[in-house]
Amino acid sequence: MNKYTILLWCWLGLALLPSSLYSQDNIRSLQQVQLLSHDECVVVQINADWNFSANIDLSKLKNCAIFNASIDNPEFGAAIKDEWNIKSVPTILMFEYGKEIQRFEAGLSFKLDKATILKKINNEIDEIQLRKFR
């Protein structure tokens, strides 16, 4: 388990006990991701360990919470794939107040166009910020 997956689980308020990770309760707990009401904007990048080089550096994004998760994690990778309907990696999901508002999925190349994706994400974050004043 890397530091990003631990952060994701801690942020969701989930216990990291191995026996609980395989229970049906864990799948319901993953649904908490869609209830991210304490953050206006959340960006989650889902990838596989074998495709790590295709990750996009999201650390420079402002005004949003950023998380990374691996579908290769033996404890909850399958639950992530099912919960978020992940068909290809990397996939980047954007949530606004817990509702998925944007999805970016890689094609056959297993890569995303970094410049285009970052521009679209930043534009969406700007829109979220503007909606606060409407």
State each model region's role.
Residues 1-10:
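Bacterial N-terminal signal peptides that target proteins for export
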Residues 9-19:
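Bacterial N-terminal signal peptides
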Residues 94-134:
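Non-catalytic, surface beta->alpha helical segment in thiol-disulfide oxidoreductase systems
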